[in-house]
Structure formats: structure tokens, C-alpha cells
């Protein structure tokens, strides 16, 4: 093992980025799945580095986000156009969520500048695949899909202006009522289908998916579970069930050779069942679902957890601590990338690395690379 680590554990410089030798084996991978700890400063330079490398060296053009499709439309609009008003709106919608960090602003401004230098067929597109966390972001995102604004009824515009004032941290009966009426009047199926096809034009199918997402998020079983996340695994399980269906939907619409990068909370990314130390339950994670049965991406998923160390403290990555061992000790003082899935890897052999209680198989059943990120701090909230 020591010989392997000396060969494949590589210090990384965020400015210089990754190279093929450092990243290592990438054969047959189409879905690169990084696992972060939310609100940490070091996840942002890591995300830039990973995205740029995967775009330039592995042909990844799609950034999948741990956000709703509506919120994703706002970000994608910004990174294609540089519309600062939309970026500010999107950031305001992130407040109170797992993406509430001022470093989000720098990330998306960097990606806009990077994207503006790419030819049209090589530009990166951002797509939200999670549930619709923020109603306001969803509504605003839908307006970006409208191709024929002259078809929008005045009554809808009035309801929209009321509904867009909904707050996450307070209840406004009039705003909620306006939202319900608006969705009822514009739901793009049944008797409304013809009209809404005229409104959304070529974007109709995307609009239908977002409306369906809103229905999913409002279902009582799911809606109530989000208030009991310490004891009820339903919230996480349903979110990942939803995400896998969105990915399936994308695979049916994007080019057959499309490749993806996603940076999610680490809990979602592992490819094999494992216990969780924070709420001590198991569930069918997104990383596991991607490799299930006949799913089109089975065997093509590369999970890359970030082992994050705060200044002066031990790792905050609760789940990665299930795997953390003395063999990493020599590599925690600087950002380090380790490819675990090379041909001669001891991490793919049983009995070489002892897994913690509740884990079975070998380390590369769970993930294939790791990125060690020392000297992290809690990121300031969005201003």
C-alpha cells in the first residue's frame, strides 16, 4: 500500500489544476460524482478545479446541481449570458439552504468567464436535479423558458407578482394562495396543454418536468419528512429517488455520449450501502441508484469524496471517517488527490484495507478517488 500511495498520491495546486496523470484511470466513466461538506471554503476551489479538468480532459459539458431544476435554470442562464440581475436573484434564493455561501457568487462569476471563452458546442450547462427547494427560484426559472410572452394571460402575471413574494421563513397566505391558483391555471397538461405549448414553445417539455417536480415536492409524505431529518430517512431517500428520475429524463434528451459532473453532499455519493454515523440509518443513495439494475450509467460512475480538514481540527467529514485510517496520515497537510482505482490498486482487494463496522467489500466499491482538502473554514453566508 505504501508503494502505491507514493506512486499515486499527488499534491494539487488549484491554480495549475489537475492533469491526466494525477486523475488517473478514467476509462468508461461518464458520471463524475464529487462529495462535499456544505458551507466549507475549500469545496469551492475544488469544484472549479474538478470542473475545468473534467471539461477539458474528459469531455464533461453538464454540471448537475444539488438544487431544483428551476434554480438550475437561473444559474445556467447566468453562465451563458452574464446577467448579473439573474445571478443576484439566484443567490437571494439560496439563503438558508445548503448552498448559502458567499463563495457561490465567485464560483458562478468564474464559470461565466470560463464559459465565455468556449465555443458554443463546448459550453458547460448547469442543470438542477434535486427537488424544488425554493418556490421563488422555481417560478423565476419558469419565466426564462417562456418563448412567446404575448401568450401569457394578464391574470397569470398578476398572480405571479403575488406568488413571487413567498418567503421560506414566514407564511404569507395571499402569496401562497396566488401560487396555488397560478399553478392550477397554468399546469401544462390536460386542458391547459395546448395553451402552455404556445407559451413555452420548444421549452414545453422542460416546463412539464418542473411542474411535475413541484407536485413531487408538495406530496405530504415528502413535505412532512423534511422536518424530521434526524429521525426519518424518507427526506433523503425521496430526494435521491427524484434525482435519479431526472437523470433518466436527461439521458433520454441529451447526446448519447453526454458526460456529467455533480458535486453533492457526500452522503448522496457513495456507491454501496453503508451506515451513517449522524442518523444511523441506511438508505438507497443516489450513488447506489446510478449503479443499479439496468440503469444506463451502471458501471460508469466515479465517486470522489472530499476529505475535509478544518484549520486546527480533525476531519469534519463524518461519513468519510468510516473509511479514514492511518494510511492517509502522511497526506493531510496539503491538498492531495489520490486515484484508488488503478490496475495495481490494493484498495480494490479484500483484506488490504480494513473497513469500519457496517461496511462490506472493498474500498473502491464505495468510491474510486479521493481529494484531501486541509485548512478549510466555514464559509461566510451570502450577503
Residue ranges and their predicted role:
Residues 1-383:
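Compositional signal for N-terminal targeting/processing segments
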Amino acid at each position: 500500500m505504501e508503494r502505491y500511495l507514493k506512486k499515486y498520491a499527488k499534491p494539487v495546486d488549484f491554480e495549475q489544476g489537475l492533469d491526466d496523470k494525477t486523475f488517473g484511470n478514467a476509462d468508461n466513466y461518464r458520471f463524475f460524482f464529487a462529495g462535499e461538506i456544505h458551507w466549507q471554503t475549500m469545496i469551492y476551489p475544488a469544484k472549479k478545479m474538478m470542473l475545468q479538468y473534467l471539461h477539458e480532459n474528459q469531455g464533461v459539458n453538464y454540471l448537475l446541481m444539488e438544487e431544483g431544476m428551476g434554480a438550475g435554470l437561473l444559474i445556467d442562464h447566468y453562465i451563458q449570458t452574464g446577467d448579473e440581475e439573474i445571478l443576484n436573484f439566484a443567490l437571494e434564493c439560496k439563503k438558508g439552504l445548503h448552498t448559502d455561501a458567499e463563495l457561490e457568487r465567485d464560483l458562478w462569476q468564474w464559470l461565466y468567464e470560463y464559459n465565455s471563452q468556449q465555443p458554443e458546442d463546448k459550453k458547460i450547462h448547469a442543470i438542477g436535479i434535486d427537488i424544488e427547494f425554493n418556490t421563488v427560484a422555481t417560478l423565476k426559472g419558469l419565466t426564462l423558458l417562456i418563448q412567446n410572452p404575448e401568450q401569457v394571460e394578464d391574470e397569470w402575471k398578476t398572480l405571479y407578482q403575488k406568488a413571487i413574494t413567498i418567503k421560506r421563513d414566514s407564511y404569507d397566505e395571499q402569496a401562497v394562495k396566488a401560487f396555488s391558483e397560478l399553478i392550477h391555471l397554468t399546469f401544462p397538461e390536460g386542458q391547459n396543454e395546448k395553451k402552455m405549448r404556445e407559451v413555452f414553445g420548444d421549452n414545453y417539455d422542460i416546463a412539464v418536468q418542473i411542474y411535475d417536480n413541484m407536485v413531487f415536492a408538495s406530496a405530504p409524505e415528502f413535505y412532512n419528512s423534511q422536518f424530521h431529518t434526524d429521525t426519518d430517512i424518507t427526506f433523503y431517500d425521496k430526494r435521491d429517488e427524484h434525482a435519479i428520475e431526472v437523470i433518466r429524463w436527461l439521458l433520454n434528451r441529451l447526446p448519447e455520449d453526454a458526460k456529467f459532473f455533480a458535486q453533492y453532499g457526500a452522503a448522496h455519493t457513495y456507491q454501496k450501502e453503508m451506515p451513517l454515523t449522524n442518523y444511523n440509518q441506511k438508505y438507497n443513495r443516489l450513488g447506489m441508484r446510478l449503479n443499479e439494475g439496468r440503469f444506463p450509467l451502471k458501471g460508469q460512475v466515479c465517486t470522489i469524496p472530499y476529505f475535509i480538514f478544518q484549520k486546527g481540527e480533525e476531519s469534519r467529514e463524518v461519513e468519510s471517517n468510516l473509511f479514514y485510517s492511518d494510511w492517509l496520515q502522511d497526506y493531510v497537510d496539503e491538498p492531495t488527490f489520490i486515484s484508488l482505482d488503478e490496475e495495481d490498486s490494493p484498495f480494490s482487494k479484500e483484506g488490504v484495507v480494513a473497513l469500519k463496522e457496517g461496511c462490506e467489500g472493498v474500498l473502491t466499491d464505495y468510491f474510486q478517488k479521493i481529494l484531501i482538502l486541509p485548512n478549510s473554514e466555514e464559509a461566510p453566508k451570502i450577503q
